[in-house]
């Protein structure tokens, strides 16, 4: 699967901080490491990652959270290394 640079950076960030399975973070926090003019592209990349089943969405009372899919971690590691 071919992903854009935003999606790869999001996967790297989530993997580095250990947001896998039960540990999740807000979608808004994923945007913080990107410039303000690119944050719309980050939201689009998150949607692509959810459709690809690489990120698991979690609805909370205080917004949308997400974590890496632990069943896809081997594929995620390969994508990050490229």
Features from the language model and the residues they span:
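Short alpha-helical segments that sit at the start of domains
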Residues: 1-20, 80-82
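Alpha-helix N-cap and coil->helix boundary residues
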Residues: 5, 22-25, 41-44
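Short acidic, hydrophobic short linear motifs in intrinsically disordered regions
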Residues: 20-33
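Short amphipathic alpha-helical interaction segments
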Residues: 35-51
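A short, conserved structural fragment
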Residues: 50-60
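Minor-groove-contacting beta-hairpin "wing" of winged helix-turn-helix DNA-binding domains
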Residues: 62-69
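Short, amphipathic alpha-helical interaction segments positioned at domain boundaries
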Residues: 71-82
